[in-house]
């Protein structure tokens, strides 16, 4: 199962926000909503082999992880408000060390980037960090669903986060020389994996 980690530095960590103001009072929650849709949606269906891990680092309780499991998620439509509603419901739950289900296929717990990286590393997953200075993704012939892709939000990734990612031996890859929005990167990544798995990669 392919995994995406999106680091959200300003995203509000309580459910006290309006679905009518996702970019503002919710701390650019609109970015996370677009990332969820890019990760999970096909033309007329949902992907069933994707997990999305939203790392929320905004106020007032930084350090929450919301996981979307595409195999079991329900009540998700292809619009920002729908995804925002599921995030809001998750944030209304008490987040502790262990996951709590808020709605089908959506879970929340407390944690940080190190928490996720350690878990993936211990599970033998391949960590891939997206950055325009990395190796061209099309040079990777073994891109499969085993990979975990790590992306920043509109603020990118801090030096401390990047150092932690490198300490966990993540491979840095690029989708091209020009920085792209995280949700656009996800669509391109999914396409590359789809092509590799179908044997049509060039």
UniProtKB/Swiss-Prot annotation:
Entry keyword annotation includes Methyltransferase: yes
Reaction catalysed by this enzyme: pseudouridine(54) in tRNA + S-adenosyl-L-methionine = N(1)-methylpseudouridine(54) in tRNA + S-adenosyl-L-homocysteine + H(+)
Record flagged with keyword Transmembrane helix: no
Primary subcellular site in the record, as a coarse category: cytoplasm
SUPFAM superfamilies: alpha/beta knot (SSF75217)
EC nos: 2.1.1.257
Subcellular location: Cytoplasm
InterPro entries: Alpha/beta_knot_MTases, TrmY, tRNA_m1G_MTases_N
Pfam families: Methyltrn_RNA_2
Protein keywords: Cytoplasm, Methyltransferase, S-adenosyl-L-methionine, Transferase, tRNA processing
GO cellular component: cytoplasm
GO molecular function terms attached to this record: S-adenosylmethionine-dependent methyltransferase activity; tRNA methyltransferase activity
Gene Ontology biological process: tRNA methylation
CDD domains: TrmY-like (cd18087)
Subunit structure, as described in the record: Homodimer.
PANTHER family, per the entry: TRNA (PSEUDOURIDINE(54)-N(1))-METHYLTRANSFERASE
Record's function text: Specifically catalyzes the N1-methylation of pseudouridine at position 54 (Psi54) in tRNAs.
Family according to the record: Belongs to the methyltransferase superfamily. TrmY family.
Protein name: tRNA (pseudouridine(54)-N(1))-methyltransferase
Taxonomic source organism: Methanococcoides burtonii (strain DSM 6242 / NBRC 107633 / OCM 468 / ACE-M)
Gene that encodes it: trmY
